[in-house]
């Protein structure tokens, strides 16, 4: 297993559940990069299908944007990988208990409804709250409800009066680093080993990978190899004759504390997000297309401009945030597709190799897809076949 982020740790854990031990190699450590800095919000899966119906941006309009924040372009749907969202979301409450027992770590899971705020002007233009809910109702099986301004102000007294209410839908959250750590420790108890080192190349025999070569000169033997290395997938996938296109982008957010705790409900408006966490902290972020910065040079430096924009934006939504104390300004590289839709995972077996696999390019959703991605990849590696319940998904997301 190359990569000790949420995806790699999940695959290692689920392989362990099948009696298959892993050696997880990472040039740094467990969840040091984006997985440990994520928002770690598990969104109710059908929300994305409903969201697609609200998107009218033509494909050609997306070209040249740093990153499009929608998940779709005409002719391509998140339905191809919706199973990853759905299975992960539906499993999380049980998974949290499982990881506490097997990994010895409280991942701080809790339900956190998410509300997309709507101004009076937007409500009038849409023709009322029922019109705003219609795309969600049309999908079927989507829990989306209108919460009016009075109810929101009971929860958030300082909410900007321009907001008349919001569309609320289910969501959950975990603490990102603790989540990956729990999976890693659970995997270790099932026989996994974690090794620090940078993989430079592979040793092969015919159509099989026999091991990996580390920068230190060490060679590690392997019965199978999985690449779960996010935006660094390019070079190693090319060595296997199947270069995977990837666009490294940078996203960042703020961890903050307030004198009083906020209710566990996410607020979103104008591409600004306020995410109260179970531990009393608040994640503050801006998430528009302009806020994903192309970092093909793999520069992971933080932006003071983005920090100030986030602080100003969230304070307009919830003025009490002017009293926030910044605990950490953090960010890291994400793996996006090189062309629209920019968020499209790659999962499966490399076509020219019997025992080489990949799970990458999850964009900013790696943590929230990792439970299902790990389980499905483990089944594929163990049985050599795509799981029937996700066969079409594997066909659409396969490398090559």
PLM region spans:
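Glycine-rich FAD pyrophosphate-binding loop
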Residues: 16-38
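Short beta-strand to alpha-helix junction loop
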Residues: 80-86, 119-128, 167-185, 299-308
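Dinucleotide-binding Rossmann-like beta1-alpha1 core, especially the glycine-rich loop
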Residues: 40-151
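Helical element adjacent to the flavin cofactor pocket in flavoenzyme catalytic cores
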Residues: 166-216, 220-224
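Central helical "cap/lid" subdomain
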Residues: 31-32, 216-264, 303
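C-terminal catalytic lobe of FAD-dependent flavoproteins
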Residues: 318-400
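N-terminal Rossmann-like FAD-binding beta1-loop-alpha1 element of flavoenzymes
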Residues: 1-24
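Active-site lid/adjacent beta-loop-alpha segment flanking the redox-cofactor pocket in flavoenzymes
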Residues: 260-355
